[in-house]
Regions:
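Transmembrane beta-strand segments that form the barrel wall of outer-membrane beta-barrel proteins
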Residues: 44-54, 64-66, 70-82, 89, ...
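Cleavable N-terminal export/targeting peptides
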Residues: 1-42, 221
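Feature captures outer-membrane beta-barrel proteins of Gram-negative bacteria and organelles
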Residues: 37-39, 60-71, 86-104, 119-136, ...
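Electropositive, surface-exposed helix/loop patches at the edges of structured domains
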Residues: 112-123, 172, 179-180, 208-211
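Polar low-complexity intrinsically disordered regions enriched in Ser/Thr and small residues
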Residues: 18-19, 23, 29, 100-101, ...
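Acidic pyrophosphate-coordinating catalytic loop
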Residues: 145-149
């Protein structure tokens, strides 16, 4: 009988120790980042956009862009951007910060192929404060076939958004996809958004008798 009591006491003691270890391990797990934060960092986000160019005395064309982002990683593909019938593929690193003055910056490196062939360091960046937004993207194409084809591309916007779904402002562009008398084209823009869709109209060189029109549509998913 005394032997059974001894065995029973030993079992109770072991169970108590095991239970104590289980409780002690609980708070350790709560110190790790919540699964939702980790999942957010691992999520992919995508966007697709198409810009239709209506150029006086020149060929009209569509310029599509597709992006994919996951945490710091930025991937992008463009067509008819650096030149007509020319594509480019990009790899970039996302940075962001700020609260009232929020900023994003993505340095990138791309390969260009088609009518123009080369490599291109580039960037995308934005600043937003109150209802104002500044966006700019640029690249310097190093033409591996002909160094005279080296060129600096840029697209920049300064906008005001009086309400969440409406923005308007100024735009500038420097491109070789089509030729004009102006090295840097200047214009006006107005854009609308609905949920994950956006639509924007641009008028470049509005002081000319026949300005260049650009109609853009985009989607995020």
């Amino acid at each position: 009988m005394r032997a059974m009591q001894t065995v029973f006491a030993a079992l109770v003691l072991c169970a108590g120790q095991a239970f104590g270890q289980t409780i002690a391990e609980g708070p350790v797990a709560t110190n790790s980042p919540p699964p939702t934060i980790e999942n957010e960092a691992r999520k992919w986000s995508f966007s697709a956009a198409a810009m239709g160019y209506l150029v006086p005395d020149s060929r009209d064309y569509v310029q599509p862009t597709i992006t994919a982002d996951r945490g710091w990683l930025h991937l992008e593909a463009r067509y008819n951007y650096e030149n007509l019938e020319t594509g480019s593929a990009w790899l970039g690193y996302n940075f962001s910060g700020g609260n009232k003055l929020a900023w994003e910056f993505t340095p990138m490196l791309g390969g260009v192929f088609g009518h123009t062939t080369g490599i291109a360091p580039g960037y995308k960046g934005s600043l937003s404060w109150w209802k104002l937004g500044l966006y700019s993207e640029g690249e310097y194409v190093l033409d591996t076939g002909d160094s005279s084809g080296n060129f600096l591309y840029n697209w920049s916007e300064l906008t005001l958004a009086p309400v969440e779904w409406l923005r308007f402002g100024l735009v500038t562009q420097r491109t070789r996809a089509y030729q004009t008398d102006r090295d840097v084209q200047r214009g006006l823009l107005v854009g609308f958004s609905y949920k994950k869709l956006s639509f924007t109209a641009y008028v470049f060189n509005p002081d000319e008798s026949r300005p260049t029109l650009v109609l853009a549509a985009g989607m995020q998913f």
